[in-house]
C-alpha cells in the first residue's frame, strides 16, 4: 500500500493465473482436461482507515481476455467495487471481517461472447490460528447474481458456494494458501468444484 495522506492509501494487485479445468460428461463417462493461462487481472484500490477497527475502500478491477479456449470468460471486463473492514481484535491480532462487492461488466467488442453483468459478493472472515497459519472464509467474490445473458443449465440467477482457504505466512511479505469451493446453490452454474493454490507477495 502506498501512503497518499493521513489515513489514506493506494493499493494495487496484479494476478496472472494458471488454470487446470476438467469437464466431465457423465452420460459418456468421459472427461476433457484443459490447462493454460487464465484471464489476467489488475486492480487498483483507494482505502481510508477510519480508526483502529474500521476502514473502507473503493476501487476498480480490470480483467483482460488472455485465456485460451474455455479457461476464461472470453471478454474484457471492468469490475468497480467497494468494501468495509472491521477488525476483530478479540479473536486475534489479524482477525477481521470484510464484506465487499464488485459489479462485473463485459466491455463491448466481442459480438460472439456472452454479455456479463453480475454482482460478485464476498463476506470475507479471516481468523488467525496458532503460529503462522490462518483460515479465511469467502476469500473470493464467488457469490454471484447473474443479470447478463444466461448460461447452459441456468435455472435462476443465484450462485452461492461454500468457500474457504487455509494458508501459512512464510514471511512478512509472502504467504502460501490453498482455497477450495463447492456450490450450495447453483441455479446459476459457475463451477462444480474449485481449488486454487495461491502465492501472495507484498511489495
Report each predicted region and the residues it spans.
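Transmembrane beta-barrel domains of Gram-negative outer membranes and organellar outer membranes
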Residues: 1-109, 115-203
